């Protein structure tokens, strides 16, 4: 019995979404039937015959498209979150094809209380439980990460390019190094943390989903609870809730993924395939090795699958005939996951509990503050003893001050001390019997006392503020809630849990009754005639034959699925082989053999991070490179101070490490002359000279033009300038009286 109690099966529920607009427009058939009472999902074969039996799967609970978000949470997830508040580890993850509503199940619709998913409902549940608790201190932390293309990113970090590493310790198991976590004190704060992470998450559009998650996201809530035990000491319980939103498996032919989307889909499918292999290996009793290290996702879910955690798996499916193959694959994996056994235990008094560190730091600061107040009391007692019996009034005043301070009225104490010093300063200033030097000395002493008092007050206030800030991060219940309302809410939640538990028991009883009906019928049946017996036996035979056919069809489908997976793996292997050959070809032709051997000798495979690394060039990893000596600054080799001084004073080369021969430069005589160009261009100068020359008067006889005016003008010659000039010189006698054209530009 103890063995049965220590182990617990993974709880698997199935949720079917409604038909979307695209599926209705394409006139796809609905092939998924959901029986909520029996917890069964039946899938029809759209290509099969009418006599073919549908494939039926039974789960812990099933929800159809009419199920509300709060029903799903109250019946399935609330008991798990209660276990986390008691100190267990818990995991909720949504599994299924892309576009089936995994993100809707986990996150829901922001701003709509009725459509809030598992994550926002768990926030309300956790902080409501804390507010109703008594004599308990809580510390709630939140972290958010994603696995994008097998790289872990911190969604709450400012530097989104930083990649985180997975580490493992014997006491805590697998954890993410340098993952940031934020202490949250209310639902509003933890929702803000989730919203910041969602803005950094990788999301893209495909043909099957407009807002497709391109990464696996894990929201981690760590709840630490401190409570005084029967032994009178504080005991700390730490519960961790992992809320996992997986990216959906997808086929490139349906999603139309290309380029970066295709790379993302390949990595998503590989990690989900590794998750399926882990589930199969855990269920199969013959497997001696569980392949957790095949992907980052399976390593992070190592405790949730077969480890120290309570796990609920939500399998999301679509009802359309278009996705029947993916629906069957999801249901088969979910059916296998039912048989995984976990061994959850309460995490009591862990060494790395942050709550204990907070409590120790608060106690240290309070002790420091108390020490300061004790010092002030001792100083007052000394002053009182020094005052003697004559200072009875002052003694009574100081006793009153001490009583006020003990009554936590510290502000009045500081104010009275300051007023007292001010009165003493005024008395010194008004005392004319004192010498000026003595008066200045006394005033300086009072100023110093006032400064010390102010400094002590600031230090005490700073310590008090630090204590308040740390105490504000620790949540204590039962302060701001009306007891009557609190009790009513508790009763209401208990009734809800009882109803959910009753539904679960009814479902289990009905499943057991159906399985035993056949056995009881065989035992109780009596036949009045041989014909009746033949008819009943024939009916049973037909029923068994249909079951046999269903099992054969299931085996055939599994074989086909196995063949497809093998073909996909072979294709992946061929692509990797081709890429490897290309790398080898580049190395052989472009990288020298010595460099290749150096890198090969330094390379090693890191099992922790699951990839190849290079050993450091130096033997010791932390050893730093030798620095240049300080005496060698500005020189090629170290020099002593004496050598430097000798170099500056004497010209001899004894102490010189460089520039031993100091030679002056031998400057050669100049053999060239600077070019001096003309002030004006030669062509321009010639034109100006020609234009400025004196010319004789020209007489023109225009009588010849009168005789030639009546003649026809000759056609213009085609040859241009030369022919024109020759014809004018030969045919026109008047042209000899005209001079040739002149100008700045020669023609």
Curated annotation (Swiss-Prot):
GO terms for cellular component: axon; centrosome; cilium; cytosol; dendrite; dendrite cytoplasm; dendritic spine; glutamatergic synapse. It comes from the Eukaryota. Residues 722-735 have a biased composition (Low complexity). SUPFAM superfamilies: P-loop containing nucleoside triphosphate hydrolases. The keyword Transmembrane helix does not apply. The keyword Iron does not apply. One of its GO terms (molecular function) is ATP binding. It is found in: Cytoplasm, Cytoskeleton; Cell projection, Cilium; Cell projection, Dendritic spine. ATP binds at residues 96-103. Keywords: Acetylation, ATP-binding, Cell projection, Coiled coil, Cytoplasm, Cytoskeleton, Microtubule, Motor protein, Nucleotide-binding, Synapse. Residues 580-747 are annotated as: Globular. Disruption phenotype: Deficient mice do not survive beyond midgestation, exhibiting growth retardation, pericardial sac ballooning, and neural tube disorganization. Kif3b +/- mice exhibit schizophrenia-like phenotypes, both behaviorally and histologically. Hippocampal neurons have altered spine morphology and synapse function, and at the cellular level, they display abnormal growth cone morphology. The modification N-acetylmethionine is found at residue 1. Residues 9-340 form the Kinesin motor domain. GO terms for biological process: anterograde dendritic transport of neurotransmitter receptor complex; cilium assembly; intraciliary transport; mitotic spindle assembly; opsin transport; positive regulation of cytokinesis; vesicle-mediated transport. This is Kinesin-like protein KIF3B. It comes from Mus musculus (Mouse). The lineage of its organism: Eukaryota, Metazoa, Chordata, Craniata, Vertebrata.
């Amino acid at each position: 019995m103890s063995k049965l109690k220590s182990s617990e099966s993974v709880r698997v529920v199935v949720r079917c979404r409604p038909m979307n607009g695209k599926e209705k427009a394409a006139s796809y058939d609905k092939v998924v039937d959901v029986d909520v009472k029996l917890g069964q999902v039946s899938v029809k074969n759209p290509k099969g015959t009418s006599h073919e039996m549908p494939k039926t799967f039974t789960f812990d609970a099933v929800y159809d498209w009419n199920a509300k978000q709060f029903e799903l949470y109250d019946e399935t997830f609330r008991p798990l979150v209660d276990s986390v508040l008691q100190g267990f580890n818990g995991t909720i993850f949504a599994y299924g094809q892309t576009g089936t509503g995994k993100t809707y199940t986990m996150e829901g619709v922001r701003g709509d209380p009725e459509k809030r998913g598992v994550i926002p409902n768990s926030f309300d549940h956790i902080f409501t439980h804390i507010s109703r608790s008594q004599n308990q201190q809580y510390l709630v932390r939140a972290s958010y990460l994603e696995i994008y293309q097998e790289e872990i990113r911190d969604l709450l970090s400012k530097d989104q390019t930083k990649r985180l590493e997975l580490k493992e310790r014997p006491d805590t198991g697998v954890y993410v190094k340098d993952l940031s976590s934020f202490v949250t004190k209310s639902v509003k704060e933890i929702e803000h943390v989730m919203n910041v992470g969602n803005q950094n998450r990788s999301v893209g559009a495909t043909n099957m989903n407009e807002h497709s998650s391109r990464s696996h996201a894990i929201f981690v809530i760590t709840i630490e609870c401190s409570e005084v035990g029967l032994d009178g000491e504080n005991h700390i319980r730490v519960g961790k809730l992992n809320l996992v939103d997986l990216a959906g498996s997808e086929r490139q032919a349906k999603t139309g993924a290309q380029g970066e989307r295709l790379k993302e889909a390949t990595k998503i499918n590989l990690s989900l395939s590794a998750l399926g292999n882990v589930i199969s290996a855990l269920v199969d009793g013959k497997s001696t090795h569980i392949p957790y290290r095949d992907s980052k996702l399976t390593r992070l879910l190592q405790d949730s699958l077969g480890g120290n955690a309570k796990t609920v798996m939500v399998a999301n499916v679509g009802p359309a005939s278009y996705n029947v193959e993916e629906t069957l694959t999801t249901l088969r994996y979910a059916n296998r996951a039912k048989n995984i056994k976990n061994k959850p235990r309460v995490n009591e008094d862990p060494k790395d509990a942050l709550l204990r560190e907070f409590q120790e730091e608060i106690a240290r600061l309070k002790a420091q503050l108390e020490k300061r107040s004790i010092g002030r009391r001792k100083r007052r007692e000394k002053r009182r003893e020094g005052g003697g019996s004559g200072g009875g009034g002052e003694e009574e005043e100081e006793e009153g001050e001490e009583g006020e301070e003990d009554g936590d009225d510290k502000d009045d104490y500081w104010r009275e001390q300051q007023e007292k010093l001010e009165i003493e300063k005024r008395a010194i200033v008004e005392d004319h019997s004192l010498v000026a030097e003595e008066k200045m000395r006394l005033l300086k002493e009072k100023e110093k006392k006032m400064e010390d008092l102010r400094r002590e007050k600031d230090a005490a206030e700073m310590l008090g503020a630090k204590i308040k800030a740390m105490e504000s991060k620790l949540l204590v219940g039962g302060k701001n809630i009306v007891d009557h309302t609190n009790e009513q809410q508790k009763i209401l939640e208990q009734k809800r849990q009882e109803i959910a538990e009753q539904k679960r028991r009814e479902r289990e009883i009905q499943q057991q009754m159906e399985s035993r009906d056949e056995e009881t019928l065989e035992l109780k049946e009596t036949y009045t005639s041989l014909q009746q017996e033949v008819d009943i036996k024939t009916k049973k035979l037909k029923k068994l034959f249909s079951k046999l056919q269903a099992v054969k069809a299931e085996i055939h489908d599994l074989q086909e699925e196995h063949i497809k997976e093998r073909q996909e793996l072979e294709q992946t292997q061929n692509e990797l082989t081709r890429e490897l050959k290309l790398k080898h070809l580049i190395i052989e032709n472009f990288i020298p053999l010595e460099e290749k051997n150096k890198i090969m000798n330094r390379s090693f495979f890191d099992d922790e991070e699951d990839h190849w690394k290079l050993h450091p060039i130096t033997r010791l990893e932390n050893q730093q490179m030798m620095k240049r000596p300080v005496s060698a600054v500005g020189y090629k080799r170290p020099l002593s101070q004496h050598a430097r001084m000798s170099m500056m004073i004497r010209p001899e080369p004894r102490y010189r490490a460089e520039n031993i021969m100091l030679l002056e430069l031998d400057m050669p005589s100049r053999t060239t002359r600077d070019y001096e160009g003309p002030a004006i261009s030669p062509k321009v100068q010639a034109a100006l000279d020609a234009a400025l020359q004196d010319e004789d008067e020209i007489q023109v006889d225009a009588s010849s033009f009168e005789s030639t005016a009546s003649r026809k003008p000759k056609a213009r010659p085609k040859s241009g300038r030369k022919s024109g000039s020759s014809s004018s010189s030969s045919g026109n006698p008047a042209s000899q009286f005209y001079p040739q054209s002149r100008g700045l530009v020669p023609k």
